[in-house]
């Protein structure tokens, strides 16, 4: 796994984990702001890493373990904050529960949690998700424009999405969707000594209902935060300055 680091001269470490369907460089708009005060660590999740096109996505569990092991090996067994969005939020959830490393703060932004459903049904849902993204790989740039809100996303944003989709193979598509919705968690989940926030956009409230309920159950002290006017995975992409301000305020809270 490729790990990208910025602001290494800073004492406090912030780990950023990206959503499904994008690459590590999706954080390019917030890195220049945050690296002034924080050591930024961004894992390029296998299957979505342009520098390692031969690597496939494995599982939320394995990726969480590899990230934790890398942090430990590099003297970062305690970090300031873990931030993960969507798929990245699933990885953060698993890292927190396993407790190989410790974090002072964590933000699970629209994070995906394991289905609490009959097992055969989870396979059917996985097949549906796989088909949708596999078909998306073959959609034209013109057709893709109709999917994105032109008032929110630029032509460069749409070309970026098309480039990422074109680079995904079938194995990564299946594994990433299925694992994000069905990853395992320790039983029982240990007490986590970390300030955890679950963020979601007001426009995705219905879609995140089960995730919020699950996170509230496993992390009873979680702070649930609704970001007004936002949809899934929009905050840091469309409003980088406001996102960084809110994240820094969260990391500045005292016990």
Identify the function of each model-found stretch:
Residues 84-92:
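Gly/Ala-rich beta-loop-alpha elbow adjacent to hydrolase catalytic centers
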Residues 230-241:
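Catalytic histidine-centered segment of alpha/beta-hydrolase-like enzymes
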Residues 41-81:
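Active-site loop/oxyanion-hole signature of alpha/beta-hydrolase fold enzymes
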Residues 192, 198-200:
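Short beta-strand/loop motif that positions the catalytic acidic residue
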Residues 97, 103-133:
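Flexible "cap/lid" loop of the alpha/beta hydrolase fold
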Residues 117-118, 137-190:
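Conserved alpha/beta-hydrolase catalytic His-Asp/Glu region
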Residues 202-207, 233:
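Acidic catalytic loop of the alpha/beta-hydrolase fold
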Residues 5-53:
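Conserved HGGG/HGGXW glycine-rich cap/lid loop of the alpha/beta-hydrolase fold
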């Amino acid at each position: 796994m490729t790990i990208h680091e910025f602001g290494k001269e800073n004492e406090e470490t912030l780990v950023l984990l990206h959503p499904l369907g994008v690459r590590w460089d999706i954080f390019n708009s917030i890195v220049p702001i945050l690296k002034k005060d924080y050591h930024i660590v961004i894992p390029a999740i296998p299957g979505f890493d342009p520098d390692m096109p031969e690597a496939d996505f494995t599982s939320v569990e394995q990726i969480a373990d590899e990230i934790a092991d890398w942090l430990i090996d590099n003297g970062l067994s305690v970090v300031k904050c873990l931030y993960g969005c969507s798929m990245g939020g699933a990885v953060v959830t698993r890292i927190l529960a396993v407790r190989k490393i410790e974090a002072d703060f964590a933000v699970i932004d629209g994070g995906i949690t394991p289905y609490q459903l009959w097992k055969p049904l989870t396979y059917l849902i996985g097949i549906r998700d796989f088909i949708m993204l596999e078909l998306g790989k073959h959609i034209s740039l013109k057709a893709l424009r109709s999917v994105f809100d032109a008032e929110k996303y630029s032509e460069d944003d749409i070309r970026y999405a098309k480039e990422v989709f074109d680079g995904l193979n079938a194995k990564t598509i299946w594994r990433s969707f299925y694992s994000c919705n069905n990853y395992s968690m320790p039983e029982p989940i240990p007490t986590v000594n970390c300030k955890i926030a679950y963020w979601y956009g007001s426009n995705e409230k219905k879609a995140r209902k089960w995730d919020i309920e699950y996170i509230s159950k496993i992390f009873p002290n979680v702070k649930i935060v609704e970001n007004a006017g936002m949809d899934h995975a929009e905050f840091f992409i469309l409003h980088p300055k406001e996102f960084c301000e809110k994240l820094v305020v969260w990391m500045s809270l005292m016990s």
